[in-house]
Amino acid sequence: MNRPAWLMARPVAHRGLHDKTSGLIENSCAAAQAAIDHDCAIECDIQLSADGDAMVFHDFTLDRLTNQQGRVDSMTAQQLSSLQLVGSQDTIPTLTAFLELIAGRVPLVCEIKSRFDGDLRLLNRAVDIAKQYQGPLVFKSFDPALVAALRRIAPDMP
């Protein structure tokens, strides 16, 4: 596979340019904006909500970054989007909202989180959203089955 030149053209801010002491929480819109302001590409993580939307959040549980407990996939996108991230005014963004903020200004590396159970709903939702996006975007996953499915579902995506 050919690696797009834009992928390595600038530093990549892992989960955005976050700094908890400054209220810039990982995978938040504020951390994404900070990365954009510093001309960094952004790496983010996505997970599936209970109602099938792609949410930008790293952990499988809410405990570390919100005042809620439980699994991310047990709440709807609307519920998750209303949860404030600890130490900031930000809430958990949908992938759609995250892409609207980035608006192609910097490249995005989007990690599709997996429980290694063969569930392709998040992958399918992410690809559907990405097809509407005009900016530089690449998906990654540590789940080989998801990567193989991505090659089948969207062979032209980097």
PLM regions: where:
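Phosphate-group recognition and catalysis centered on beta-loop-alpha active-site segments
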Residues: 1-158
